[in-house]
Amino acid sequence: MLDSNGSNTTAAAGVALLAKAKSLAGKKAIVLAGTGPVGMRAAAMLHIEGAEVAITSRSKQLADAASKAINDRFGFAPTPIEAFDNEARAAAVKGAQVVFAAGVIGVTLLDEKDWQNDPTIELVADCNAQPPLGIGGIEAIDKAKERHGKIAIGALGLGGLKLKLHRACVGQLFESADQVLDAENIYAQAKALA
């Protein structure tokens, strides 16, 4: 089971809950801080659901490198966007229906004012459980909770599925010693459990 620092199970749980809440096919999805392990996997899983995906980074170079790495591993290249600050990230989410925040602890990637009245945003998910959260205006415990007319999922809201998924995958490994569970397999399992 490949799950470095929980990156596959975290991304899988978040995207599976988004997909359960609403179809992602044809939606524009932005992964904020999409150059880390959770963000890159979330981008791939959003793509599996048929979303048009972009990833942001503070650095265009890092965004380009992550897009290439995602393409090398998953066979599609998300649009790389440099979004150095909150203003640039607010501009990046304009026109998106899905926002997935995968940033580090203690960094707000998107202020509440930048998404609460946006007419196109339908779904927001945040993997950061420690305040300040990655997306302002949602709570870590949100699990498909309506906020400002949008569906919000917080880190603890997806955490239950993440732990259930992790246990199920580890249990599956005891059934046969010759299997490999990577991002795609783990995501399929997350969808079944969501």
Task: Place the predicted regions along the sequence by residue.
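Alpha-helical transmembrane segments of multi-pass membrane proteins, especially transporters
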Residues: S4, L32-G36, D118
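Glycine/serine-rich phosphate-binding loop and adjoining beta1-alpha1 elements at the start
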Residues: M1-A25, I153-G159
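General beta-strand structural signal in soluble alpha/beta enzymes
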Residues: M1-S4, V31, A125-C127
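Short glycine/serine/threonine-rich phosphate/pyrophosphate-binding segments
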Residues: A11, G36-A42, A63-D64, V107-L110, ...
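Rossmann-like adenosine-cofactor binding region
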Residues: P78-A152
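Adenosine-phosphate binding glycine-rich loop
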Residues: Q130-A194
